[in-house]
Amino acid sequence: MEDLLKRVLSCEAFQQPQWSEPSQLHDAQAYLRDSASLIRVEDILVLRATLARVAAGEAMVIQSGDCAEDMDESTPDHVARKAAVLDILAGTFRLVTQQPVVRVGRIAGQFAKPRSNNNERIGDVELPVYRGDMVNGREAVCGHRQHDAQRLVRGYSAARDIMQHLGWKASASQEQLSGSPAWTNHEMLVLDYELPQLRQDEQGRVFLGSTHWPWIGERTRQLTGAHVTLLSEVLNPVACKVGPDITQDQLLSLCERLDAKREPGRLTLIARMGAQKVAERLPPLVEAVRQAGHKIIWLSDPMHGNTIVAPCGNKTRMVQAITEEIAAFKHAVTSAGGVAAGLHLETTPDDVSECASDAAGLHQVASRYKSLCDPRLNPWQAITAVMAWKNQPSSTLASF
């Protein structure tokens, strides 16, 4: 494990916090290293077996949860409400697909976000941009926006509580599809949080102890970067977001790094193309990966490629664009011989107005906007998105 740590630390790492107090970082990392792993290696093996079934076309996947988690929402009530939405979406997806559904929450660690800019201007003041509760505060005050390493410990504590509320106290003894509890995943972004949580089992296998199923995003998928280097060597199943600008050669090289042994279900690719690009850009990528021998799970992230700005100035997403991308994604993957296995959604149990169900909704986006970062689907909109799986690419949605 020490060799892996050295390799990762020798690589360039993008989107990392600039901590204000190095001594606090040292203390936080020591705490994380000495803390109990949030997951067990036995659970990882169960999940990998389950995802092998998904890669074979025998089951589907629903991933849903906050864009950026609120660390204060680690109470039993908050967790139960989020899990309930995931259960509803999984049940709906099972009705639509007539297949078992693996439930996965964007939860218990989705506390950090990559950002396009390091700073933002609020009024006459330029401040560090908010990067998630694990890094800095949301309040538009300089002191709150400093990168605070003590938040790493708070993040671990919140994640631990959430895992317990989800039901991860008992051991996993069989493949879990629609059973409880839900699996957890988050973007593996802040290496000062992730690296101290590397663990090694009795057989010498290294696994990430912070989540069951880590993913990396468009901004951290550099082939020789620290994030890819780390994910390439952990026992966990791994995932990577794939946008419209990736080339076939880049994707094949990425798959070779993350799935060198070509193990079914080891690697999931989450397509975030945008409704206007998915039909053109995705099929050649799916075909290239299939011909290279990778048994990939393909998921659709229909959110990030369809972000626009509402008249009020808030970021939003049109539900119609989301449903159109879902239908086009399914057709694109299946027509190219891949396994279109499910959805990766940003959702909330709250009745928010962050995404617009129709043109009139664009003018109401700000009325109930609670997201810490990007716009999420409310429960009714999320059900609409799941139902779009049965649509043909040209279908239109029913408005809520």
Swiss-Prot record:
One GO biological process from the UniProt record? phenazine biosynthetic process
Q: Does the keyword RNA-binding apply?
A: no
Q: Name one Pfam family in it.
A: DAHP_synth_2
Q: Highest taxon of the source?
A: Bacteria
Q: Which UniProt keywords apply?
A: Antibiotic biosynthesis, Transferase, Virulence
Catalytic activity line of the entry:
D-erythrose 4-phosphate + phosphoenolpyruvate + H2O = 7-phospho-2-dehydro-3-deoxy-D-arabino-heptonate + phosphate
Q: Which InterPro entries match?
A: Aldolase_TIM, DAHP_synth_2
Q: Which SUPFAM superfamilies does this chain map to?
A: Aldolase
Q: Which GO terms describe its molecular function?
A: 3-deoxy-7-phosphoheptulonate synthase activity
The EC number(s) given in the record are 2.5.1.54
| Pathway membership, UniProt | Antibiotic biosynthesis; phenazine biosynthesis
Family named by the database record: Belongs to the class-II DAHP synthase family.
Q: What is the protein's given name? A: Probable phospho-2-dehydro-3-deoxyheptonate aldolase
Q: Which organism's genome codes for this protein?
A: Pseudomonas chlororaphis (Pseudomonas aureofaciens)
Whichever gene encodes this chain, its name is phzC
